[in-house]
A protein has these predicted regions:
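Conserved GHKL (Bergerat-fold) ATPase module
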Residues: 1-330
């Protein structure tokens, strides 16, 4: 099937080919990408986007490499970019050298061009699907976001292209591209120092009260829950703009997006000095630091927060231990 032109195949042909390749795979692929180029290198193939779990607990080695229709290997490391090794399918090229090391493959001129071509084709396909039927793309987002986010982290060219179709869902079920999100939130969510703050939650139920505090002020709260999102936020924040992500439970919302408004404490200094040691005696000193602040009357009297920087560093260390397909490189 991969040696035929796309014009000679219909959707049923691709479905049957996928079932033939993976007879034990009960779920159909989400969509496919047909590769067909003969200059400056020769490459044919069909790649399928499977439905993936957000956990990244999945197998690679699902893309089969052929040379002139003769099976060679299902290990395409060094040929196909890391983030695309989660796809399934077949590639066939006589221009890929065999019996060389991974470093040798990565240094080979033809392999570099093939890898770049595959990345571009995938990005173009995703952009086309987004433009053609955005509603359907949004429905599929949770099943494909890990691949896209991983690609944005590992491939700068893919990152630039993905800005047009990568989505940022909110806790109320809306989806925005990055540019749409920035435009919608820049006025309300810019603090007194000119920092544009994007608020997010990782768990709607566990962080419900914090989300309510933020949405009550008219702020958008994103729902970002993939295992590599901390890495991606770090990369976006490093883009040179005065923009940062803050999880809703990192502090009181008025501290996350500080405005010029000043809230006057209803407690005197003496009352504060009396109350603080009472609270400190009730919580483990090794775990919590007690801080008394003036807040608006709608706020809960007690809040437990974890500073954004500390929590994010822990999350990045946890996902960067080398157990997630090379994520230790980030």
């Amino acid at each position: 099937a991969w040696n035929k032109t796309p014009a000679d195949l219909n959707d049923e042909d691709y479905t049957n080919f996928y079932r033939e390749l993976y007879p034990m795979q009960f779920e159909e692929s989400l969509f496919h990408i047909h590769l067909n180029v003969d200059y400056p290198f020769n490459l044919t193939g069909i790649l399928f986007f499977p439905k993936l779990s957000p956990s990244m607990d999945m197998q690679k080695d699902k893309i089969q490499l052929y040379q002139n229709q003769v099976f060679v290997t299902d290990n395409v490391e060094g040929i196909v970019p890391d983030f695309l090794q989660m796809l399934k399918g077949v590639i066939d090229s006589p221009d890929i050298p065999l019996n060389v090391s991974r470093s040798g493959l990565q240094a080979d001129g033809a392999v570099k061009k093939i890898s770049g071509y595959i990345t571009k084709k995938v990005a173009d396909k995703l952009a086309s699907l987004f433009k053609k039927d955005r509603a359907d793309f949004e429905k599929k987002w949770n099943d494909i976001k890990v691949i896209i986010e991983y690609g944005m982290l590992s491939e700068d060219k893919f990152f630039d292209k993905a800005k047009k179709f990568a989505l940022y869902p909110t806790v109320d079920g809306s989806y925005f591209t990055f540019d749409e999100l920035v435009e919608k939130t820049k006025d309300a969510q810019t603090d007194k120092d000119g920092n544009h703050v994007l608020l997010y939650a990782a768990n709607k139920d566990a962080q419900h009260s914090y989300i309510q505090n933020a949405t009550a002020k008219g702020y958008e709260v994103l729902l970002l829950d993939s295992p590599i999102i901390s890495h991606l936020m770090q990369k976006i924040e490093g883009g040179g703009e005065k923009l940062k992500f803050s999880r809703v439970d990192a502090d009181h919302v008025d501290n996350l997006i500080k405005k010029d408004d000043t809230i006057i404490s209803k407690l005197s200094e003496e009352e504060t000095a009396t109350l603080k040691p009472i609270i400190e005696a009730a919580v483990p000193k090794e775990t919590y630091t007690v801080q008394l602040e003036a807040m608006d009357s709608a706020t809960s009297p007690f809040m437990i927060t974890v500073p954004e920087f500390m929590r994010r560093m822990k999350e990045m260390q946890a996902s960067g231990g080398g157990g997630m397909m090379g994520m230790g490189n980030f």
